[in-house]
Amino acid sequence: MNKKYFKKYSSILIFSMSILAPMTLASCSYNLAKEKDKDQKESTNLSEPNKSNTSKTNTFQDKKDSTNKIDSQESSKTQSQNTSESNQNTKVDSSKTNNLATNQNNPSKSNVNIQETNETKQEQNINPNNAVISEKQAENDKNASSLNSKQINNTLKNQDKTKQENDQFKQESKDSSNFTSPKPITHDPINKVISSQSTTRLEMPKNDQSNSESEDNKKSPESPKWWEKLNQGDAF
């Protein structure tokens, strides 16, 4: 019985070992490959920061070099400008000395020479900003002059128009005054109003005349009649 169990269990063990052995070998090889990959990655990660640091240092150095070059160029420009200004100042000083020497001999020309030196200084000190400002000022002056000319033309036109209207009004008033105006109204002695334009004398109608004559004869036979008084007033 023991031999049977031993053979049986031994066969099982051999079978299990035959299965487990390659699995263990495969897992071991897989783990070894993982470790190798990790080592390679770590080595690459360590090498890459060094590369980035070197590139950063190189770019920083290049920037420094470029800034230093720019600074050196600007300093050289400023030095050249300073030398040119000093040369101009020396020229101005020499012109001043020459002008002083000539002014001592010719005092009448001293003011002219001083003005010329001042004008040269002003021309030398003018910068582009001043040139732009002067151009803007010139444009503003042109615009102002054009506006003033327009206003002057408008005022002249208005004056001419008003003058023409006044002349026309005066002419119309003269023409109206030349027409015959009505004569003033006069009063007769009996307070009867008649117009001076009418030259015809008043005449009573025939029927009314007879009645008025009879009434006047009754009142005062010797007194003149009222229409005769009217005619006498017109005569005066």
UniProtKB/Swiss-Prot annotation:
Keyword field: Cell membrane, Lipoprotein, Membrane, Palmitate, Signal
Organism (species): Mycoplasmopsis pulmonis (strain UAB CTIP)
The encoding gene: lipB
Feature: compositional bias, Polar residues: 43-60, 75-112, 143-157, 193-212
Domain of life of the source: Bacteria
Keyword Membrane attached: yes
Lipidation, N-palmitoyl cysteine type: 28
Membrane topology: Lipid-anchor
Localisation: Cell membrane
Similarity section: Belongs to the M.pulmonis LipAB lipoprotein family.
Protein known as: Lipoprotein B
Positions where lipid (S-diacylglycerol cysteine) attaches: 28
